[in-house]
Design a protein with these regions (language model features):
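N-terminal cap/lid segment of alpha/beta-hydrolase-fold proteins
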Residues: 1-24
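Conserved acidic catalytic loop of the alpha/beta-hydrolase fold
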Residues: 79-98
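Conserved hydrolase catalytic core segment
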Residues: 96-136
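Alpha/beta-hydrolase
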Residues: 141-222
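Conserved alpha/beta-hydrolase "acid-adjacent" motif
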Residues: 240-246
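Catalytic active-site module of serine/aspartate enzymes centered on a nucleophile-bearing elbow/loop
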Residues: 256-287
Length: 287
């Protein structure tokens, strides 16, 4: 069993009146771990179903603006998300929690680490900074064109991404996944949870997903060298979707970060290796 339905769901109202949707798994008095989920998967897709309670983790997933239950914020930035999470952690009594950033949620989690929101961070199958000059010759031709277009004309690229649907995104993800990942994604319980998460993420349309994607594909205004909390970077060695070098350069750019390359799995490593990911994170957080 890779995932279960959330134990608790709700929304908080921010100071400007917007809502942020959230979901929680695990004991309410457990060690808080914020979760920044992947592309358009919303608060409904968690991880660590069989280990969260045993580890005493209170996993808290948050919908980014425009996704799921969170109010849209057109033109939002990474800094806006950090400000939202600063309010959210205070309102939910989370203190300075550890955090997990998965896939396209990774740069948002890194921004939170730079902004002092988190006490420790795990990046898992993180969407890398594909606009970084070091990757100019390493990207597949089609991805290179897409990145160049996004950098050159982000508004036009955002309109293109806003044409995506839950079905189109799911087809794209499955078509680029190795068999070891498909074994996870096609498991009945996971497939149902994944579909629900995607449907909720696109409930307000695709604008939230489009904004996320433009931010992730553009040069990041995040000073990775200023991150001072413990960071672990996890990739499956068969992952060909998230980083040109499975996070080697990303790890090197973050002071003191540790790189973990997991054999025989790809982008589904968050669900197949939830226990070592969370156990390591709790150690870094001092829990």
């Amino acid at each position: 069993m890779y995932v279960t339905a959330p134990d608790r769901v709700g929304e908080v109202q921010l100071s400007d009146g917007r809502l942020l949707g959230w979901a929680e798994w695990g004991p309410p008095d457990g060690t808080p771990v914020l979760f920044s989920p992947g592309a358009a998967t919303s608060r409904w897709l968690g991880f660590g179903a069989e280990v969260i309670a045993r580890l005493g983790v209170r996993l808290v997933s948050v919908d980014r603006p425009g996704l799921g239950a969170s109010t849209p914020l057109p033109g939002r930035t990474f800094a806006d998300f950090v400000a939202d999470l600063r309010q959210f952690t205070t309102m939910r009594g989370l203190g300075r929690p550890a955090m997990v950033g998965n896939s396209q949620g990774a740069p948002f989690a890194l921004a939170c680490a730079e902004g002092g929101i988190t006490a420790a961070l795990a990046i898992v199958s993180g969407a890398d900074e594909v606009a970084a000059p070091e990757f100019a010759s390493a990207l597949p031709a089609e991805l290179r064109k897409l990145v160049d277009w996004t950098v050159r004309d982000p508004a036009d690229a955002e309109r293109f991404f806003a044409g995506y649907s839950a079905d189109a995104l799911l087809d794209f993800i499955l078509s680029g996944s190795p068999e070891c990942d498909l074994a996870v994604y096609r498991e009945a319980g996971f497939a149902a949870a994944y579909r629900r998460a995607l449907n909720e993420a696109f409930a307000q349309g695709a604008a939230g997903y489009a904004r996320d994607t433009v931010l992730a594909m553009s040069p990041w205004p995040i000073d990775l060298g200023k991150i001072s909390v413990p960071v672990d970077v996890w990739y499956g060695e068969l992952d060909q979707s998230h980083s040109p070098d499975n996070g080697s350069l990303l790890t090197a750019r973050i002071p003191g970060a540790e790189h973990h390359l997991v054999p025989a799995i790809g982008g589904a490593v968050l669900w197949t290796h939830a226990e070592p990911i969370l156990s390591t994170l709790l150690t870094r957080d001092g829990a």
